A protein has these predicted regions:
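Binding/recognition "hotspot" determinant
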Residues: 1-243
Length: 243
């Protein structure tokens, strides 16, 4: 820049310098997004709700709410969660090259040539769950001929009555957030300096300086956690569970 003062091994030069550079650069990036989101269904009543099936009763990512709620199935009752998933992918690329020259009072001082390129990619995925909820203000009764499965969901009331012909299973689900990125850069630089010997006043071209640089940055992150506990919840009148 203007007013640069520099000193180098045995050569001393003070004065005004002018830096000139010519170059070009191009860059391109793209991203893709994909997502699915559950929209819950609802059965809501100020009175009683009774659902009976000779086969199975399956509730997924939905709500059933009433004064007294009864679920009766000849086979299985399943309260499960719906999945919400968001995925983002991205890529970027760039490259460039340039020539630089520095001029001082004595003329040309150095010439440099540089070139470089970079590329990167990233992937991110977020998965959450929308659980089912079966809630009674008073009594919740669930009776299955075979299994009662509660996965990532809740069932509750002031009093809860459960009767199964086989198994009772309760399982919480884990939400997750994963992120991966990788960025790579590389470049080269060639430079030659021209100096003036103070004893002779003659110009000489120094040995060329050549450098190569490479860099890679990688990020990997994974977060997994149960954010909502599945379960059967009873109020002051408690549970009556028969398995």
């Amino acid at each position: 820049g203007l007013g640069d003062v520099y000193k180098r091994q045995g050569d001393v030069k003070k004065g005004i310098t002018l830096d000139v550079s010519i170059g070009s650069r191009s860059a391109k990036s793209d991203s893709r997004y994909q997502g699915t989101e559950a929209k819950e269904s609802r059965i809501v009543s100020q009175g009683n709700i009774r659902i009976k099936s000779d086969e199975n009763i399956a509730v997924k990512g939905s709500q059933i709410t009433g004064e007294n709620v009864t679920l009766q199935a000849g086979k299985d009752i399943s309260l499960t969660a719906a999945e919400n998933r968001k995925t983002t992918e991205g890529n970027s690329r760039s490259k460039g090259a340039g020539i630089t020259a520095s001029f001082g009072i004595g003329g040309l001082q150095n010439v440099g040539i540089s070139a470089g390129k970079s590329k990167g990619n990233m992937e991110e995925e977020i998965m959450t769950h929308t659980g089912s909820a079966v809630t009674a203000k008073e009594t919740l009764a669930m009776e299955s001929g075979k299994d009662l499965n509660i996965t990532g969901s809740k069932a509750g009331g002031k009093k809860v009555e459960v009767k199964t012909g086989n198994n009772l299973s309760i399982e919480s689900l884990q939400d997750s957030h994963t992120y991966h990125s990788r960025d790579k850069e590389s470049g080269i630089h060639l430079q030659r300096d021209i100096t003036v010997r103070p004893d002779t006043g003659k110009k000489k071209m120094d040995d060329p300086y050549f450098s190569i640089g490479k860099k890679t940055d990688t990020t990997d992150s994974t977060y997994i956690s149960v954010t909502k506990q599945a379960g059967i919840y009873a109020g002051k009148e408690g549970y009556d569970i028969q398995v």
